[in-house]
């Protein structure tokens, strides 16, 4: 079996590529990073380590690398022969990989076996969005192709090693794929197959992503370098846990998850965040605050839905306010957000980026927490 995976970064090698290799696929990584691609072509294997004592490294073999800028025709040929195409490039880059995917699918013969194209991105409906991008580039031709939506979860921190291919990850992983519209399921080890993926995507978004983001933004306020350091602070942990119980109420109300099971899920997530061996930098988790403060993302969306249910999301509002205080000059979105606050004020910034209007109850709740944080900062400095 053959798989083509777009994105030879840490998630691609340490999660998706690893599971595909363990499932029996020959994996070709497609990327524009010369160092990684050349190393893959020369070595044809790499190692994955785990941020936990007593867990051995795994050798991932039968891998290759192709630079899509230098050898686009080769990528097309590989897709034309693939059983599976996956991506882990980031939501904003799906439109960049779509043309090659479209060309490769159109090169397939009508009688060819089905091919599955799965976007393994940190977003809702990633494969459906990728399909739209592929259709906009010329479609799939006569190919027998499926685009099942997926949800993925594994913490892979920023890291540097002498070996450019080595990657270290947490032991936990979750890869959920939707079965709707599939005639059969492609063989992938470690995947959970579900009929309706929406609840699982939102559970992950409103728990893992919400908690991670809040820990990073409050941790940054308190001068913490890593997520595990942040969670050692009583106040950070209190807000994170409180926010996850707020989103937990919402998830139980919407999807009927079992209360005890979800409470255990929350504690498992927090324990993952606390892993000191991950050394997960606050700056990595906090990056791109404009995207994370978007109306359909991990912070504002659950807060709005809780308000619609008559519940004030105080801890979420504090986390949102902390995100509005976040500043990292090396993060362009952080700089843009801070400039907007300086030039137009906090209320206008909330309206522009969070799509929350001045006078809304949620807006006022966030403003109250924003000013509370400002007062708390003054007290810490004095």
Swiss-Prot record:
PROSITE patterns cross-referenced by the UniProt entry: MANNITOL_DHGENASE (PS00974)
Signal peptide stretch: none
Family classification: Belongs to the mannitol dehydrogenase family.
Species lineage: Bacteria, Bacillati, Bacillota, Bacilli, Bacillales
Any one Gene Ontology BP term: mannitol catabolic process
Alphabetized GO MF terms: mannitol-1-phosphate 5-dehydrogenase activity
Keyword line: NAD, Oxidoreductase
Keyword Oxidoreductase carried by entry: yes
A GO CC term attached to the entry: cytosol
Biological source species: Exiguobacterium sp. (strain ATCC BAA-1283 / AT1b)
UniProt xrefs under Pfam families: Mannitol_dh, Mannitol_dh_C
Catalytic activity: D-mannitol 1-phosphate + NAD(+) = beta-D-fructose 6-phosphate + NADH + H(+)
Enzyme Commission number(s) from the entry: 1.1.1.17
Chain residues that bind NAD(+): 3-14
Name of the protein: Mannitol-1-phosphate 5-dehydrogenase
Gene3D superfamilies: N-(1-d-carboxylethyl)-l-norvaline Dehydrogenase, domain 2, NAD(P)-binding Rossmann-like Domain
